[in-house]
């Protein structure tokens, strides 16, 4: 009987639910510097009370933003406060605002660009590995994988080479999981999109799929077909988890967004994968608990 109980406890301890993440993504912006330390610490404590276990920094550099010493120091302080509140920390690396424009280059030019991007990511990883009072629990590649530019196997070879190298070299800096996110807009079939993510998964990089409900480019039924193909529990789906969008995008050319209604957000926050996949939310500033603290 004791042996049976021991085996049962062991299975529970190693079940996928023991490792599934409930994370909130914070997209650092310069205007967030107006938030006081007290406000931020209170917000991090509220996240823990609401069941979140992880804060994901979408990036720690965006173009030239967050390159000044005082900006970096503030990000370090924000990250340390999250860990002090009991949250794990996934550190986003370098984000290039022109990432999607560079994908239209020749294969050779694209390969050269992705190598430069990797060098910038490694610089951020080394910087944050040495940051005082912080121990990153994982790394997030801030570039996003779309379903337009990597449709053929030939076209995605530079992507896969880059991700293979990124996973290996970032892990050399700190042997923690490496993540990236992906989104779909109907440019591939659901099965084709699943195959793309299977190739990404094979590089060792964990991929999260954005649910697309905030940008609302596809119908709910169309989005569900993509999510079932890429992140479902009924079949071996390649995604490590789903990012649920907590915002409603505006209709203009310039991106604007507002939070979804509180009741809809509450329904999304209650979601949990039935097979232990990660559940993430974008983004912190749209959570009701962040209203009056982070502008949107």
Curated annotation (Swiss-Prot):
Pfam families named in the record: DUF4434
Signal sequence residues: 1-20
Lineage: superkingdom: Bacteria
Protein keywords: Signal
Any single Gene Ontology cellular-component annotation: cell outer membrane
Entry's Gene Ontology BP terms: secretion by cell
Classification via InterPro entries: DUF4434 (IPR027849)
Keyword Transferase: no
NCBIfam families tied to this protein: PRK09936.1
Protein name (database record): Uncharacterized protein YbcH
Record organism: Escherichia coli (strain K12)
């Amino acid at each position: 009987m004791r042996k049976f109980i021991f085996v049962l406890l062991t299975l529970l301890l190693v079940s996928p639910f023991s490792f599934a993440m409930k994370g909130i993504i914070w997209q650092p912006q310069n205007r967030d510097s107006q938030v006081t330390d007290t406000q931020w610490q209170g917000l991090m404590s509220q996240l823990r009370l609401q069941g979140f276990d992880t804060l994901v920094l979408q990036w720690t550099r965006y173009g030239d933003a967050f390159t000044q010493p005082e900006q970096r120091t503030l990000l370090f302080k924000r990250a340390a406060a999250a860990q002090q509140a009991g949250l794990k920390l996934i550190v986003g690396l370098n984000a290039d605002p022109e990432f999607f424009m560079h994908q239209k280059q020749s294969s050779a030019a694209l390969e050269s660009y992705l190598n430069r991007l990797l060098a910038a990511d490694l610089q951020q990883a080394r910087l944050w590995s040495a940051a005082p009072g912080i121990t990153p629990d994982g790394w997030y590649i801030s570039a996003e994988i779309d379903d337009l530019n990597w449709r053929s196997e030939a076209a995605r070879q530079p992507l896969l080479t880059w991700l293979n190298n990124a996973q290996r070299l970032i892990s050399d800096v700190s042997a923690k999981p490496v993540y990236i996110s992906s989104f779909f807009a109907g440019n591939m079939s659901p099965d084709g999109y699943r195959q793309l993510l299977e190739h990404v998964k094979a590089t060792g990089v964990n991929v999260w799929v954005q649910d697309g409900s905030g940008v609302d480019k596809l119908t709910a039924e169309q989005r569900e077909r993509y999510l079932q193909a890429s992140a479902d529990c009924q079949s071996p789906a390649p995604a490590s988890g789903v990012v649920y969008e907590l915002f409603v995008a505006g209709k203009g050319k310039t991106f604007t967004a507002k939070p979804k209604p509180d009741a809809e957000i509450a329904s999304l926050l209650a979601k949990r994968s039935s097979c232990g996949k990660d559940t993430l939310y974008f983004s912190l500033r749209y959570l009701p608990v962040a209203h009056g603290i982070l502008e949107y």
